[in-house]
Amino acid sequence: MRDDLDLHIHTSHVGCANETMSLPALLARCEQLGRKHIAITDHLNGPQHIEPQSAIHEELPSYDGPLSITWGVEATIADAESGAITVTAEHVGRFGYDFVIAGPHGRYEETDPDAIIAINHRLMLATVRNPIVDSLVHPWWFSRLEWDRGTMTWFEDMSRIPDSHVEELAEACVETGTSVEMNGGAIIHHARYTDRFKDDYMEYIAALSERGVTFTLCSDAHDIEKLSYATDAAQFLADAGVPDDQIAAPAVTEF
């Protein structure tokens, strides 16, 4: 079990993570948790995140500790029609990212369950086929706010997702070398996901693994107490039968 990794971590710089997630604090906690290799992957969703990304990039080289660190970024969908994401090759060149993670983050105004599934599948395929993307983030994650609105209350398991979607995603991942993320925070500890959903999700991960897909694992922590969720993601992959040699890790950044 690869509980030495955490490849999706947010910081207090961008603002989606709280004040506990300063770089010094989160790096110290990762050391305490026994992590060996982590990735800092804060959001770049638009111009408002350029300055915080610059601040992270300037601060990271001051770390002088045992952790191997990869400088990365998380993108979301910029255009649901084309599948374009918010991070471009120009951003990668400007900031020197060594790891780009991306994927859908919603239902994109759809209300019909089958339409929500269809658009998310289409956007996941577009993300995986984007040449700058290294890992598809938290497949089939939806905000808990959608349950509060009543738009995702039907999503108690994965029975509506066609088997063909698994086949198509696996084929695209293997063809492009893009990994699928196992996310402790967004999936395992999601406030609205049922045990039945998580059982189905384990079968989903196992099916992708059987077809040769590789995986990254992470906490997706926005609070320092949730950095431990990467261990839960590692255990989930192990329980799904994913061998360690199908768990991917990006190159370590040389600052």
Where are these regions (language model features)?
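A short, flexible N-terminal coil/short beta segment enriched in small residues
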Residues: 32-51, 221
